[in-house]
């Protein structure tokens, strides 16, 4: 018979995850000890190990729970059955909202995945690919010509480049908030998407041939 968890276990666990994410984001995963996490959370180190067996498991939970929320956004938007543009706009808005509420967790996800154990890293990277594939599929539905030209993945990654790193420079204020930035990101993306020609890869390939083929795509 499984041992019952004490009342408040999940609340304490979520608090530990939040405080650990803050420390990892501020100091870096490698520079933060479990002693510091325990002190930050106001618990003893033995008590901390009651919730997480080691620091790597703590990191894995932070990354996977953040990704789970992002995957939930994708599934909720897909369930609405929207046309490609409104679906992409809604995903952008929801992603920006999630990032605004989880800036520490997002920084940890983007900067500390390399410290994960192999199995955990594989799961996290597959979770990221799921999200990228979903957005890329919507872009492909909107511009099938660009899909045939091999441009959908690069364009999708350019979009993620706009929103994934906002935490490094954008500070929400009274005049410009995360909510206000989301449609700006969408307008920039769709304005640029309409200007992209399906022959662009041919031009890049031609230039690569001229310099000995030293240029590589995103996947190389």
Task: List the predicted regions and their residue ranges.
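Short secondary-structure transition hinges
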Residues: 90, 96-136, 145-150, 168-170
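Amphipathic alpha-helical packing segments from all-alpha helical-bundle domains
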Residues: 71-75, 118-143, 153-157, 161, ...
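Amphipathic C-terminal alpha-helical segment
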Residues: 97-101, 105, 137, 156-176, ...
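N-terminal intrinsically disordered/low-complexity leader segments
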Residues: 1-11, 18, 22, 149, ...
